[in-house]
Amino acid sequence: MKKVLLVVMSLLMITPTMQAKDKEEEYKVVVVKNEANGSYAYEQVVNVEGVSKEEMFSRAKKWIISNFKTNDNNIQFDETNLTIANTATVVLKVASGFNWALTSGLVNFKLNLQFKDGRYKFVFDNIAVQAAYSDGIVETVNYEQVQRNNKPAKHIRKEINEKLLAIATQMEEVIKTGGGKGKDDW
């Protein structure tokens, strides 16, 4: 009887630990599938009170130049239509788990901004991922192809959503308040 009780108690103690490991980390999913064309994007319209569309464009232009400027000058600013288009890259955090390790990763995406009085719209689309694993495999895939239900794919999806949300949040702060000017104050 004591042995049976001991086995039952040990199983009860192990169960919460096993359930906690199966639980996926919570994060806000911002990259969603467009049902009309099947592609994935992060799109949002942000209301801005008391700032003209020209001023929003100017603030966004300065922020993009200071954060996404590259040697190939791939940023397109259209001052007549008040639009900005850019391709940008962010780096994924390395991670590992049982039987897998992401040794490096990059996410490329296209950023489009449009400005109107009282609001602006941004779209992050054409999301592509390049991931290198510890076994030597390097894969380049679109976000649509990162929908596998394994640990590396879950990590990559989480990283992409968190990084794009952080970019959108920082950009919103700069466009609304004109912040970010203290960056050169070293």
Predicted regions and their residues:
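Ser/Thr-rich, low-complexity intrinsically disordered terminal regions
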Residues: A20-W186
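Bacterial Sec-dependent N-terminal signal peptides
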Residues: M1-D22
